[in-house]
Amino acid sequence: MLHLVVYDISDDGSRARLAKLLEKFGLQRVQYSAFRGELNPNDREVLARQVGKFVRDDRDCIFIIPLCQRCSSTAIVISNTGVELVKEKGVEFV
């Protein structure tokens, strides 16, 4: 299932290590602190356990959000980067 992972991590080093971990899980960066990609239920559980170590103070937070096919196919992306951020049919680029 497609997932969106967004985070706010205050420590620069921890934030960089978290990004590398998300890339190891095959997720693609779509914003500075946001990644998206396919995770099976087992990988999602493993990822959830591993990212907990990056939450160290009250300001730190990580969301792992599942996106159903219908929701992801109706996404609206507002960007001028020219980077292919999504591949689903029906996604509107503004």
Swiss-Prot record:
- Which named protein is this? CRISPR-associated endoribonuclease Cas2 1
Q: What is its EC number?
A: 3.1.-.-
So where does Mg(2+) get bound?
D8
Instruction: Work out whether the entry's keyword set contains Nuclease.
Output: yes
The GO terms this record gives for MF are: metal ion binding; RNA endonuclease activity
- Record-stated family: Belongs to the CRISPR-associated endoribonuclease Cas2 protein family.
Q: SUPFAM superfamilies under this entry?
A: TTP0101/SSO1404-like (SSF143430)
Q: Which UniProt keywords apply?
A: Antiviral defense, Endonuclease, Hydrolase, Magnesium, Metal-binding, Nuclease
InterPro entries, A to Z: CRISPR_associated_Cas2, Virulence_VapD/CRISPR_Cas2
Stored NCBIfam families: cas2
- The membrane-spanning stretches of this chain are none
Q: Which GO terms describe its biological process?
A: defense response to virus; maintenance of CRISPR repeat elements
Identify the enzyme class.
hydrolase
Q: Per its Swiss-Prot or TrEMBL entry, what cofactor is needed?
A: Mg(2+)
Q: How does it assemble?
A: Homodimer, forms a heterotetramer with a Cas1 homodimer.
Q: What does this protein do?
A: CRISPR (clustered regularly interspaced short palindromic repeat), is an adaptive immune system that provides protection against mobile genetic elements (viruses, transposable elements and conjugative plasmids). CRISPR clusters contain sequences complementary to antecedent mobile elements and target invading nucleic acids. CRISPR clusters are transcribed and processed into CRISPR RNA (crRNA). Involved in the integration of spacer DNA into the CRISPR cassette. Functions as a ssRNA-specific endoribonuclease.
The organism named in the record is Archaeoglobus fulgidus (strain ATCC 49558 / DSM 4304 / JCM 9628 / NBRC 100126 / VC-16)
HAMAP family in the cross-refs: Cas2
Q: Which Pfam families match?
A: CRISPR_Cas2
What superkingdom heads the lineage? Archaea
